[in-house]
Structure formats: structure tokens, C-alpha cells
Amino acid sequence: DEELKLLLESLDRREERRCGERDSANRWRSERGYRRLPDFKKCAFTDHLKPMIILSLHTGMRRGEVFDLKWQHVDFTVRSIAVVGETAKSGKTRHIPMNRTCLEVLGRWQKQCAKSSGRVFQNADGMRFNNVKKSWTAILEQAGIVNFRWHDMRHHFASRLAMAGVDLNAIRELLGHSDYEMTLRYAHLAPEHKRKAVELLD
């Protein structure tokens, strides 16, 4: 998918740029005898944005669910994320398996964060994010992507599952749709899956 490729490339460029800016700032501080800031090159990520976006792309979680996610709901042993009912739109807890990409990114992010049972993503004040509109808009502009909302990453996740032949009911459960009709919008993306189903009658 071209948009996904552009988005990830833009995220990588942002990481490189922020590393360069931090190096420049630390040279300035060293020359004047000020305390150096943490070296971004020794960190897995320069901030929350890249792991937050990758998590969204690989789990289909809603933005609010990502903001509310706590480490206690991330099980690295069974490779699963619990979206608890109080934070889920449907009011029901669902479990989303983590693929290798998601597992690696969250593992690296956890090592970088202070050990706590708090939120996976916290703002500079240690509080819940309300939005990431400024950084999200900037990353899209740098990628040359237009008319793409944060919620579209959720659609992208579901579309890839449908095209891979995943059962629509499984997609519904992963997305946390309370209404099956909402999941049916992805049915047209799985023609091969439907063809194989009909061939079972031969």
C-alpha cells in the first residue's frame, strides 16, 4: 500500500531529523557547560509517535483505546493486548493478538519507558494524551498524504485482514464492532475467500 509506505518513510525521516536536532542542541549545551540532554541515538524511539502509529496499524485499535492502554493490559508472554471494557467503545473487553512487528515495537518502547504499571503512552506531564493532532498533521504533510485520518489506520488494518482471507467474524471481534453490519463493509475485499467457500460445494 503506497500510503502506508509513505507514512512509514515519513516517520523514519522524522526520527532521523529529531536525532540530528538533539545532537546539535547537545553540542551547543556542551560548548556552554550546560547539562546535555538524553542522546536520542541511544533510544529506540525519539518520542511516542512512531510506536503509537505502528501499534495502531497492527492492531486496529481506536485512537482513544491507544491513549488509554496500560502496560498491565499488554501481555508479552501470550503476545496479546486486552482492550478493557471501560475504555472500549462497545463497553466489552476484547483481546488482540500481537504480531511480530507489534511485539518488537512495544517491547523496545517498554524498555525505553520508566518501569511502571501506568499508561503505555504518556505526555510530558505523565498524563493521558488528549490528541496528537499537531505531530500527526505534520507527519502527513511531510509524507505528502492527504485526506487521511488517524481512524483510517483502523480501516487499513481491517482491509488487510479481509484481503488475506480472514473470516469477517474474526475481523469483527478484533475491531470490537458491536454491529456485524459495520464489518460487512470489508466483505468486497475478500473475493478469493468467497470463491474458495463456494468451491467447497463442488
Language-model regions: role of each:
Residues 46-51, 127, 146-164:
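Short basic/aromatic active-site micro-motif
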Residues 7-10, 94-97, 104, 108, ...:
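DNA/chromatin major-groove-contacting recognition/catalytic segments
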Residues 73-80, 146-147, 166-185, 196:
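Short, polar N-cap/turn motifs at the start of nucleic acid-interacting alpha helices
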Residues 83-91, 103, 175, 179-200:
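Catalytic-site neighborhood detector that most strongly recognizes the C-terminal catalytic loop/helix
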Residues 55-56, 69, 160-161, 174, ...:
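Short alpha-helical segment immediately N-terminal to, or the first helix within
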Residues 1-63, 67, 77, 88-92, ...:
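Basic, Lys/Arg- and aromatic-enriched nucleic-acid-binding interface segment
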Residues 1, 88-108, 117-138, 149:
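C-terminal catalytic core of Y-nucleophile DNA break-rejoin enzymes
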